[in-house]
């Protein structure tokens, strides 16, 4: 833990620097809410007669609608009952929005952000995750969900939707087969 805290501190500094250098405004939105966001698969944590936020999205979108064109937030979020390799009930979330940006713009932001932070924290633009070296530059693999499922699960969820089968096949058939040496983005979720 002692070794991780200075790295976390450098990462948080790099995240803020990335957005500040690009003209984003850092915002803080409420953590304790009168009512939880209506999320089908996400349970909010109660806090007395209020709820802890699961995401700052709703309040940030109000700021965006109010005229702030580029905003970001780093802060605590809470999700009840989520604990595992990829989930913890309390965590720090980064969320950002740009007026008039589409998902390809946000994907470009993400690519630049990860390379920027890796360089700032590690001194290079590649990293090792679970023993696998991942090059953050120059290219990222990009597949549609339909392409990935057709290739590794043998069906197309865009034309044959089955929510239970989708979740199971994503975890058991698609994710294990995705390339490991570069970041992979699945687009066009049904």
Could you say what each language-model-derived stretch is?
Residues 116-190:
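Metal-assisted phosphate- and nucleotidyl-transfer catalytic regions
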Residues 1-105, 115, 165, 190:
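Class II aminoacyl-tRNA synthetase-like tRNA-binding/catalytic domains
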């Amino acid at each position: 833990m002692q070794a991780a805290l200075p790295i976390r501190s450098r990462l948080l500094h790099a995240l803020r620097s990335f957005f500040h250098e690009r003209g984003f405004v850092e915002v803080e939105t409420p953590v304790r809410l009168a009512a939880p966001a209506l999320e089908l698969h996400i349970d909010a944590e109660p806090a007395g007669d209020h709820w802890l936020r699961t995401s700052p999205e709703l309040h940030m979108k109000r700021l965006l609608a109010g005229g702030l064109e580029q905003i970001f937030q780093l802060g605590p979020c809470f999700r009840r009952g989520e604990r595992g390799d990829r989930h913890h009930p309390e965590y720090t979330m980064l969320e950002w929005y740009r007026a008039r940006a589409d998902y390809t713009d946000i994907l470009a932001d993400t690519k630049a952000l990860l390379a920027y932070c890796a360089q700032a924290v590690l001194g290079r633009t590649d990293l090792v995750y679970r023993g696998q070296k991942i090059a953050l530059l120059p290219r990222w693999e990009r597949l549609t969900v339909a392409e990935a499922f057709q290739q590794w699960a043998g069906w197309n969820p865009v034309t044959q939707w089955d929510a239970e089968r989708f979740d199971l096949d994503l975890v058991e058939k698609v994710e294990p087969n995705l390339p490991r040496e570069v970041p992979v983005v699945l687009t066009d979720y049904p």
